[in-house]
């Protein structure tokens, strides 16, 4: 009966308290009953359960083998912690990682728990498996108020963890100022190294902790490297911690020059160096000038090393350009930079800031001497039998004949002894062995071109940073004009110099024209790489489309009105952000990513030429489009043309192909290339033939009575439009007929659609600078925008006709098709463009190629062979005029020259 009553009482108490009133007999089950109560600090319930139980309060459970005392200390359950201690819980019991309850209380800042644990003799000197003590945990988290209490119980404040780090190390690393001061006041060793030799100052600098570094230095911390020779300054510069560098320099002024010299270290990230020097330069005017002067001196030294042929070209070139970039960056951020209009000295005024360039004048003088020397040797009389290379060989004491300079043949005797010396009387050197500049096999142009071009690039950068944005330095323009012939020799010998060092051409239209013919002769692939390198040069991520886009910058468009909604949202969007990254989402759809972006561009490229918008009309070939001169029927036509330009510019910027092809004349308008009468064939083939006829025949006695005016339909009424002022009274003659043809071409192809062209270019140039796009011709621009089409050679052969003596079985024809099969896909496209004016094969294959008067098969006509004669074409009738070459090798060579070097001998036969 008593037992039943006892069970009933237990049941009643359990129901009233909504918990068990007795612990299970086994510890494993009991501990999980107690744990939530301990975490909630329900000490009365815990006490009641423990009072009638044999539970072991030191029982370790779980994966990490902790006791309930660990749980109480970790959660700050101070009442339960005291209860457990009174019940005999071991305050120094370590879990599987070696942590005691005191460690956990210290890590989480449980002050009351720490105090009670210390009362019950918790050992503050116990280390966990990593060697960390409670004092380390307090230092890591900056628990200074607890540290004051704990250090009184610590026997060694410099106790080390497994890596030899003390509490002072970790406090300095985490920037806890008051903790650092407390540890130092408690006797911590300020210069104690860890196992790798790193001191507390080293740790503070590794994370840019300026304030803790200043406390250490103020208290006499030594500036010491680690065992690998890495110094605190190295760490500051690596992390870009300008403020911490400033503190180090305050206590160790000699480090200022060290930072300047660090610009030569290619292992240091350039942006971090810029960050540090930018901060230091903004502290005072004198320090700003001191930094710039130091950088100029280092650049000059590196430049002269680069001009020495015994140096490593690649390393010295990178070092010089890196230093000059940093120099220009620091110079621009000063209060008298070009951007804020304060005089920088480019008008001839010598200001303190412009004087920082003075050390560089030595380098520019040496550069000028080199170029003058080379120009002098190139101009010497051909009777002289000794070229520059021979002179270099004589300096080496060699008597063998030097190789000739085949590209220039610049003979001329003499010796460098008779030439004006450069700075420091240094003279060009040539070393034997495996030196880059071995005169045994290379002439002086080959040896020096890259080196001098790199210095020219540095010179341009320094000239530019002294000018307001958008202006080219008159001094640099004068320099290029002075040395024009030598620079062209460099480029002719090694065209890659343009892409490596002559970046100034893209920013100086007045200089670009001097080299454009050389640039356009370079491989299309190389120019594409140069184009995108400079297009994205000022942007944070070169992989533009894949750059993350914030939710606010997503283009949310409606699929059922994609053209109008896209036009509206793109017109309002931030152009800079669109250049950096683009993301599209269709309204009501969840999909995003590159697939959606590609779909968006693809749909828009079709919508742009949708007849409903009246923006473009289909040309005579049935596959290309031309701006519609009557687009004004759409009131928003100019806004839409601007949007079309934005879409094509965006697509090119993000390397997205568009499914749209324009007439050759429109590509010319985009590139700023003048149209010619052959372009008229795209919109009016018969009229183009008439213009060709005028040019090909003597019109003196034909009585055409043409004047420099034409009749045109203006809003339904015929009006006479003069081609030039007073054109209605100027007769077209044999002497001025070429001018007439050009002016009437411009009227049909340009003036009639000038507002549309201007609106389109306004949008296009928001994303693609005119200076960059001019790297390409109209054929290449089509490939950039619309990609490389696939060409079926068998279909091409099947649908080709032969005339003027050629037949399918002729050897020349067989050689031709063998060459077509051998060349690259890109070269096949160039051939197709060369003959038909288009890079595309229409739907249905070569059987559907259009000519000026309808369907016109690809045709090959025989031309009598003369040495060096190139193939020509008549695009209006898709005819290739192929000379009767004597061999396949000559045929291939001449054909590729015509394709790559622009032998576009178009006629309207």
From Swiss-Prot:
Description of the deletion phenotype: Mice develop spontaneous, late-onset cancer. Moreover, tumor incidence in mice heterozygous for a p53/Tp53 mutation in higher in a Hace1-deficient background.
Where does the HECT domain lie? 574-909
E.C. number(s) listed in UniProt: 2.3.2.26
One Pfam match, given by its short name, reads Ank_2
Q: Where is this region: Disordered?
A: 398-433
- Where does this polypeptide localize? Golgi apparatus, Golgi stack membrane; Cytoplasm; Endoplasmic reticulum
Q: How is its activity regulated?
A: Sterically autoinhibited in its dimeric state.
Metal-binding among the record's keywords? no
The terms describing its cellular component in GO are: endoplasmic reticulum; Golgi cisterna membrane; Golgi membrane; nuclear body
Q: Part of which pathway? A: Protein modification; protein ubiquitination
Annotated catalysed reactions: S-ubiquitinyl-[E2 ubiquitin-conjugating enzyme]-L-cysteine + [acceptor protein]-L-lysine = [E2 ubiquitin-conjugating enzyme]-L-cysteine + N(6)-ubiquitinyl-[acceptor protein]-L-lysine
Known post-translational modifications?
Answer: Autoubiquitinated.
- Please name the catalytic residues of this protein: 876
User: What keywords appear on the UniProt entry?
Assistant: ANK repeat, Cell cycle, Cytoplasm, Endoplasmic reticulum, Golgi apparatus, Membrane, Repeat, Transcription, Transcription regulation, Transferase, Ubl conjugation, Ubl conjugation pathway
Q: What is its main location?
A: Golgi
- ANK repeats sit at 23-55, 64-93, 97-126, 130-159, 163-192, 196-226, 228-253
Q: Does the keyword RNA-binding apply?
A: no
Q: Which GO terms describe its molecular function?
A: small GTPase binding; ubiquitin-protein transferase activity
Q: Which CDD domains match?
A: HECTc
- Tell me how this protein assembles: Homodimer. The homodimer is autoinhibited and stabilized by its N-terminal helix. Interacts with RAB1 (RAB1A, RAB1B or RAB1C), RAB4 (RAB4A or RAB4B) and RAB11 (RAB11A or RAB11B); in a GTP-dependent manner. Interacts with the 26S proteasomal complex through the 20S core proteasomal subunit. Interacts with RARB.
Domain comment, as recorded: The N-terminal lobe of the HECT domain is important for interaction with E2 ubiquitin-conjugating enzymes.
Protein name (database record): E3 ubiquitin-protein ligase HACE1
From the UniProt record, report the name of the gene that encodes this protein: Hace1
